[in-house]
Curated annotation (Swiss-Prot):
Residues 99-377 form the Protein kinase domain. ATP binds at V105, G106, A107, G108, S109, M110, G111, K112, V113, K128. Residues 14-25, 1023-1061 have a biased composition (Polar residues). Pfam families: KA1, Pkinase. The gene is KIN2. Residues 1-83, 572-591, 629-687, 730-749, 860-882, 1001-1061 are annotated as: Disordered. Residues 1098-1147 form the KA1 domain. Keywords: ATP-binding, Cell membrane, Cytoplasm, Exocytosis, Kinase, Membrane, Nucleotide-binding, Phosphoprotein, Serine/threonine-protein kinase, Transferase. This is Serine/threonine-protein kinase KIN2. It is a peripheral membrane protein. The active site is at D248.
Amino acid sequence: MPNPNTADYLVNPNFRTSKGGSLSPTPEAFNDTRVAAPATLRMMGKQSGPRNDQQQAPLMPPADIKQGKEQAAQRQNDASRPNGAVELRQFHRRSLGDWEFLETVGAGSMGKVKLVKHRQTKEICVIKIVNRASKAYLHKQHSLPSPKNESEILERQKRLEKEIARDKRTVREASLGQILYHPHICRLFEMCTMSNHFYMLFEYVSGGQLLDYIIQHGSLKEHHARKFARGIASALQYLHANNIVHRDLKIENIMISSSGEIKIIDFGLSNIFDYRKQLHTFCGSLYFAAPELLKAQPYTGPEVDIWSFGIVLYVLVCGKVPFDDENSSILHEKIKKGKVDYPSHLSIEVISLLTRMIVVDPLRRATLKNVVEHPWMNRGYDFKAPSYVPNRVPLTPEMIDSQVLKEMYRLEFIDDIEDTRRSLIRLVTEKEYIQLSQEYWDKLSNAKGLSSSLNNNYLNSTAQQTLIQNHITSNPSQSGYNEPDSNFEDPTLAYHPLLSIYHLVSEMVARKLAKLQRRQALALQAQAQQRQQQQQVALGTKVALNNNSPDIMTKMRSPQKEVVPNPGIFQVPAIGTSGTSNNTNTSNKPPLHVMVPPKLTIPEQAHTSPTSRKSSDIHTELNGVLKSTPVPVSGEYQQRSASPVVGEHQEKNTIGGIFRRISQSGQSQHPTRQQEPLPEREPPTYMSKSNEISIKVPKSHSRTISDYIPSARRYPSYVPNSVDVKQKPAKNTTIAPPIRSVSQKQNSDLPALPQNAELIVQKQRQKLLQENLDKLQINDNDNNNVNAVVDGINNDNSDHYLSVPKGRKLHPSARAKSVGHARRESLKFTRPPIPAALPPSDMTNDNGFLGEANKERYNPVSSNFSTVPEDSTTYSNDTNNRLTSVYSQELTEKQILEEASKAPPGSMPSIDYPKSMFLKGFFSVQTTSSKPLPIVRHNIISVLTRMNIDFKEVKGGFICVQQRPSIETAAVPVITTTGVGLDSGKAMDLQNSLDSQLSSSYHSTASSASRNSSIKRQGSYKRGQNNIPLTPLATNTHQRNSSIPMSPNYGNQSNGTSGELSSMSLDYVQQQDDILTTSRAQNINNVNGQTEQTNTSGIKERPPIKFEIHIVKVRIVGLAGVHFKKVSGNTWLYKELASYILKELNL
């Protein structure tokens, strides 16, 4: 930063101030070829000594020396004339410290406001740049001739004092902003004084001005205006309790945050008031100024804020100001008379409040206490608007802190520390203050349940010291000490301005100290963890070096190299294992580096629910010793990976993370590549003969790993001719660290989990399954299927959401790329709440991923030719029938809300992540509803189910596909409905009406071929790879496909729409091209994947109608809306279908 005493932001560095106070060029200017140069290093404060012109390179192209002399002489002549002042250009700063200036968001006569961004933290704030008035005036005076007489000198001195007063107001605004701490007051973090400007760093309020909001929306409903009014009243209570008056309260100075809360800004006209004195400064905006200001009458302070508050409230509920006229004189008279017209739509209560606030006589005007306690302000609330004043205690001379006084001096609240100390002692020893303090402690003692009253020596008692400490640290909203009381005057609130400033500064110092202590504690904790990690690494290295086995050295060297540079991996110290194992020889084996998961409970996924786990829950204390006896553990936990938060943080800070992301697309070409060890991960289970997997693996399927697979954990795939999972290891083989290849081969030499891991996990699974079975009342046959699911989950390569526990940890390479570039699959699969966690019976067969390798069929879910078992259709239809029966039930709204309340967080993504919109007039009565979101969601699912529309629930809504029968309906069985409430006749009427809308020319061969080629061109932009599944097969359990197959070929592809659903998502959820990726719309019913327009019976197929239903939350008005969006298909049919769905929804 430049030094204000040595550097000014002038254009030409050759001009220096002469002794007479005027600017004149130095002789060096005549020898310098640079006539006008930008700011040099000396101006920027980077060069303190005299500049050597001959050694410094020119900053501009050289000019003619003769011309430079003439220009310099001309400037010297201009300086001698009164109107020939030298014009000085200001230096325009582009950054301040680590804050980079982005854009100007506001400007005025005093300065401008710029949006800034921190280089390291990327935090967004705003900087208010205010001109230093006195410095600008002095610069201007330097260019003028010297005063000629004494009167001119006095006039200039008076003007200078006026400019200095302006700077004092700016400094006062900055000082008050730094000590104020209230949720409805915009924070001021720091102020920096430069040579010509003041820079004030403010909190960024992204919602805009309340003025813009009123212009856009007009007058507000009273319950919305009440929310804003309570925020304003809360902020004014805080200010007035600290002897601060705003004096410029208006809708332009009230901001709205992104969460809908108000923030008061612009304390440039604020001042400190005293109830014993009066103020004489008349300031404010004309429309919101109190009549006593226009009449130039002295005032105390709070009453002018009450008047302005009343005008603001009137604007909120009426959409206009109460006093308005083009002529300012007439406007003055209207304000002084105070006659207000109230519209007829206002309630009696709000009119009653406004008529008490907008009163010309300040003595008859309502106080802030009356406003806060008014019935209109508290309608719909159980409490009055809080002031958020922290708990305070009356001061004594012994409690005055020198550190607080120094901070007050630094902020320029006081001029002398010792004088202020004496003033404070005089105030706290006044008889009135001591009496109020005694009453305060008596009242507090009664509130705390203490029988004895406090005497004058209460501070010397240990019990009373404890009382003071507990009172200060308690919640102000619970203590009730600062509630207004007509019979009691609180000595800690607005007793004297000096005491109030002392309390505010003391609280600011306490906040800074607490923040510093937290930072120091985090730093010490990080250092301790780093030392512990270094000790663990050193111990592991020592053990490895002392071992003579070359196999162990080879297997241990790679993970240790990965552990050293990564401070985020914490491992348990290596401890020798017991020699009781029958399968391993531990006499010459190094100890295992195994991680124990901090919790075996299974919380919700961090990336699928807003209520994600805290990092403190992830980095809990690790257990110490693991028994070496291998225990049979479910393969589900063989590849437990770290939390997505931890993994993402580590990948951002490691070169390996960059290469890992780059190499995601090519992993399938390197089946033997190893990956670095995982933080907080359980190693794979040691597979021995004594702990065989209880599930048979009759089939195997090779699955490649892609960056588009949203697996939270990757199960080992079973590749043909790979290592047998039951194979017994060699007698002297060692337990190597986990090795994960891209093909996910099973390794027989893997360490075991803790002995109690399976027990706890199985108990939790049984508990979850039992709750779901009790809720849905599944029969004994379904119970057998569920048990088979639990046993067979080890062989499941797809990530079934209905059986995945909450909050599973993610490997860093398996996480989504970023929040802004999230994979669409990871944003889709969540658990529908009403069939709470129904395990589909098709999971036992894996529905294709464990099918025979020689039976290849087109699998729309994985968008490739994967193996699908022949009986996959049976399971899918059974699951869909179950879901149909559940959502077809006529449930009451109360039952729906009860089911929704029992659902875990993130299980209803369509309403957990609704899109908020402010567009007025965008929705109609038909597309909006005042019903709760769970009821709207249930109605949508019920209607789609009754209409046999395949759908998938994703974040923010539903993705739907309407499969239509072919033209020649006589050759194909008629589609029947399985839903309850929509009979066959009604379904056929809808079907016939939709069929009649479609002309036969639309289904001509030429049109189909053209459409097919168009879809293929879209698929060329797909950011995926062939043979890479886009979604886990578990998506079938979240879709509706209750249609009876039209043909044997179609029956084998009952899940055909799943592929289309997996390729689409809502636009605002993801940022990829997800309209149609291939020509799968034409070959859904084609077993061999051939792109044909006719099925095996020669019947022409009609392209399906694909559309999205967005669930939108309309802000302010509190309504839920639905928004339809067509993806593909006939537009006229889509319009008719959407209209029919809206009619059935009956929102």
